């Protein structure tokens, strides 16, 4: 039987040794959406982040679990948040009703979640932030394994 990656409890990074940087949760962030495994972008002030929206360009990274917290604990506005910026395999949140297959390119969706990149004009769907490591097709938000490696340039799906 083949070996595979296991989704660990209370951590987001599954494999790899990525760069992790602390940023402040910005004033424009929605605290309830600032959960580990959600994608973030820069907020209005230096060194601050907020949840990414759909089709975002300029992704900073995704939120990691604070050492003294649990995976279900959201960061509050003003908290110092751990943001993973480097390449790794991570357990991230796929938007409900997205049908992805291993290897599909992923882009940001609302509230810092991920969605499958659809066929479209180059750059019209935001940055490709990674690729699905497993398939998913459920009607609720789902944790999936993602090869996190944000692209430097937008690319169209084919």
Task: Walk through the language-model features, giving the residues of each.
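Surface-exposed, low-hydrophobicity beta-strand/loop segments enriched in small/polar/acidic residues
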Residues: 1-158
């Amino acid at each position: 039987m083949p070996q595979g990656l296991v989704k660990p409890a209370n951590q987001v990074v599954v494999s790899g040794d990525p760069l992790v940087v602390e940023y402040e949760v910005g004033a424009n962030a929605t605290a309830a959406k600032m959960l580990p495994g959600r994608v973030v972008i820069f907020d209005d002030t230096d060194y601050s982040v907020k949840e990414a929206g759909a089709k975002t360009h300029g992704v900073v990274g995704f939120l990691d679990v604070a050492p003294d917290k649990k995976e279900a604990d959201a960061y509050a506005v003003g908290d110092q948040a751990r943001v993973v910026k480097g390449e790794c395999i991570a357990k991230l949140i796929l938007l409900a009703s997205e049908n992805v297959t291993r290897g599909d390119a992923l882009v940001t969706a609302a509230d810092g979640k991920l969605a499958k990149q659809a066929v479209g004009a180059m750059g019209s769907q935001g940055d490709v932030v990674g690729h699905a490591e497993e398939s998913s097709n459920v009607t609720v938000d789902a944790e999936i394994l993602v090869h996190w490696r944000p692209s430097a340039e937008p690319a169209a799906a084919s």
